[in-house]
Amino acid sequence: TDSAFAVARVEDHIINNNVDFVIIEFAMNDQWLAGETRCRTYEGVLRKIMNNTDTAVMALFVNERKEPFPGMQHEQQPICEYYHIPFVSWKDCVLKTGSKADFENYFDGTETVHPNTAGHGSIASFIIEKLEEKKKNLPADKKIPAPVKTLPAAMTDTGFEFAKYYHKDNIKPISNTGWKEGTPRHDDWIKRGNVREGWQTAEVGAEITFEVEGSTIGVTYCESDQFRNALAWVTYPDGTDSEKVPLQCFQMSRSGYYGWAYRELVKGDKVQKYTVHVQCSKRAPKSQAGKPCNITGILAAGKTK
């Protein structure tokens, strides 16, 4: 997923499992996350882990196949440096030890985003190298300083550090004209802990509403060629409505597998109560006819700096 959807997952998949070590990689998928959201959610994931666990954290920056090897390293590396989080840049490591042409061996066919087995092996080798370097340079046990428990002020804001994820198990709609509980689940997430589900409907124009509290409000949803698009918006405390935001649940390119997306509905600097509306699109092309739309949950950011 991208780092916004990771905010919704981090409690179940990392914090509640009391893991010893985690590698954070969103340099690839955050390319398709809205610019005003990327750094805030990436920093939010890091702060959630560092403030709620003793988990050791390393960052990984993966890139696309073709030059200039796109990825979000240029945005994420400064955040890691700010928090003294060690990182591995696949692109930098390959170009330092080999050549640009090496990346042609790390992807199959016309694939440009997902590395093949050799590509994953290359990434793993650089992670191992970084860990061995850190281990080699460790001081004697008695000279290892106590870990710092107080984080510095946030670079962006603290909203996503204190985000709450609403789903079918912890919130009920205040109105509903045709949505039912239940959404797709990722097999890997099932293996690692709880999988939160939301709501879906194939009824054209069906609307579901919720009352939530937060500074920034967004919705998460599942993408594939088996869905129909939806619309989402909020009613502000003064009774006015925000603009309607399209939820692109239908993605022709995702055939046989799911994508996981986040769309922000409102961004604020203080916690307020909002009414969230989601509506199954009334108009859709034939390719979406009869298919359901969905939301897997609502992500409500909390405090800000």
Language model features: what each stretch is:
Residues F5-A140, R192, G198-A206, E211-G214, ...:
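Alpha-helical cap/lid subdomain in secreted, periplasmic
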